[in-house]
Every structure is written in C-alpha cells, then in structure tokens.
C-alpha cells in the first residue's frame, strides 16, 4: 500500500512536471511565434513604404531620363529637318516667284515652301492681297497720268465740235472706272498665276513633301515622348497601390481585434488563442490526474 501511494505520488509529480514543461513549451513556442509574426508584420509595414518610395524615385529618374533623351533627340532631329526643309522650300519658292516675275509672288512662294500646311489652310487669299497692293499703286499712277493726258487731249480737240471742253470730274470718273476694271482684271489674272506657279513648279512639290515629313515626325514625336511617361506613371501607380494595400488590411485587423471581434483577427491572435486553449487543456488534464492520484492514495 505504501509502495502504491509512493508510486502514485511520484507519478503525480512527474505528470504535473511533464504537463508544466509541455505547457511552458507550447505556450512559449506559440507566444514566441505570435510575437515573431507581429514583429515581422510590423517590419513589413515599415519596409514596403520605404521600398516603394525608393522604387518610385528610381522610376521617376528613369522616366525623366527617357523623356529627356527622347525629347532632345526628337526635337533636335525634327528641328534640323524642319530648318533644312524650310530653307530649301524658301529658295524653291523664291525661284518660282522670280520666274513668275513679281516680288509678291516670290514672297508667297516662300511662305508656301516654308509652311505648306498653313498656306493650304489659308487658301489663295493671302497672295491675292499682296498682288492687289502692288497693282493698285501702279494703277493709281497710271490713272493719274492717263487722266492728265486725256484732259489735255480733250482740251485741245473737242469730239463734239462745239468748242466745249469736257469737265475734269467726268474725265476723272471715267478714268477711275477704267482703273477699277483694270485692277479687277489684274487681280483675276494674278491669282491663278500664283497658284499655277506653286502647283506647277516641280522642285517645290518634292520639297514641300519633304517639309511635310518633319511635321509628321513632330506629330508622332509627342506620342513617343508620352510613352515612357505613361510607363512611369503605371509603375508609380502599381507601387503605390501595393504599398497602400498592406496597411489597410493590418489597420482593419487591428481595429477588429481592438473591438473584440477575435474571429477576424490576424494570425498572431489566432496563435495566441491556440496557445491559451492548449494551456487550459493542460490545466484540465493536470486537475484530473491530481484527483485520480489523490483518490487512489486515499482509498487504497
């Protein structure tokens, strides 16, 4: 009987110590794991913002370099092409204008050669204005001389034979009407010449086509410039999105844990719950074993 009591007591102490050790091991491991997980999450929360900021800075630098390089290349190339083309177009236009034989037509030819798109939008109205300004001065000079000659002729010889001299106002009105008719005829004759000179000159057409090519390159170059910018912004948006996702989840889980909703907590709280459950089970087993040992010791 004494042996059984002693063995039961020894067994009780061994079992209690074993359970205490296991409980301490499980509790320590789960608590340590939970603590490590919380530390890792806190480190992850602190690291991704710094990494994202560094990545966004690198992305901004690469984007700026790409934009600067492509912009400089595109602007330099298009600028050189545009200057060369406009120079050649101006020479060709002035040559065609010289053949036509009027300074105003030479100016309009240079304008068409330098910027064919703007002159095509304007239409033939601008060269018409230049030609009318040059011809009106000549017409006024010619009408003044012709009116004086006609006045002298009318004073010397009267067509009616009655010795009456025509009034100078009537002569001036007639000469002005004639000058207006001449001006209209000159403007009508000059307008198609400028158009024909611009369209028929074989040298102006290929040079105008060459001039239109840099404009097409200029219109395409902003798209090329905007491409690396779009990439840069896409990278920034992705990084910021990935950065902002983690703290939101953690903040929600922290709010839910602080409110008392343990079902929606993170892995750290679940591990703590498991460790507490295991500790309670171990305590329950210890109590049962203690009662059994005491019962055997008492009744036996």
Curated annotation (Swiss-Prot):
Sequence repeats: 51-58, 61-68, 69-76, 77-84, 85-92, 93-100, 103-110
Signal peptide positions on this chain: 1-20
Covalent lipid adducts (GPI-anchor amidated asparagine), residues: 274
Assigned GO CC terms: plasma membrane; side of membrane
Protein's recorded name: Merozoite surface protein 2
Glycosylation sites: 22, 36, 177, 249, 273-274
Biased composition (Basic and acidic residues): 149-165
Annotated segments matching region Polymorphic region: 44-226
Biased composition (Low complexity): 124-148
Keyword line: Cell membrane, Disulfide bond, Glycoprotein, GPI-anchor, Lipoprotein, Malaria, Membrane, Merozoite, Repeat, Signal
Primary localization: membrane
Polar residues biased stretches: 167-193, 200-228
Proregion residues excised on maturation: 275-300
Region described as 7 X 8 AA tandem repeats of G-S-G-A-G-A-V-A: 51-74
Entry remark concerning the domains of this protein: The N-terminal region appears to be involved in lipid binding.
Keyword Transport on entry: no
Organism phylogeny: Eukaryota, Sar, Alveolata, Apicomplexa, Aconoidasida
